[in-house]
Amino acid sequence: MNDKKTINTHTPLLTNIRNLLIQGRKNTVQAVNSIMVQTYWEIGRLIVEDEQHGDNRAKFGKRVLQTLSAELTKEFGKGFDTSNLRYMRKFYLTFPIRDAVRHELSWTHYRTLLKLKNELARQWYIDEAITQSWSARALERQISTLYYER
């Protein structure tokens, strides 16, 4: 009987610890996502800077990205196909000021946002995604239903 009383007494303690661990894990995921986004922005910057020093953009686009993709994939695993490297390049070109990149959004959010040509719409979706805590899937759904245009 005493054991049941002890368990009931510690239930708020257990709940508080669980909540702390859940929040800690959530913060960890957000921190990792933020660092990934910053890293991909830097990769995009390096690609653009290298491209600007090259003589032939067509050569760069095909050969260099394919070589980078093969080497990075071999060393770091998936996530570095030529398509994703092009997105990183476009990410830097679209957001040339690093501080303008919002840490609340994941790389998947940004890949979705990069498909938008309208800069005002893109900024509106960024603000809404952060304010409304949209997942990347929810953001994609809102864009596909032309939520901004309504």
Predicted regions and their residues:
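Basic, low-complexity intrinsically disordered segments
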Residues: 1-150
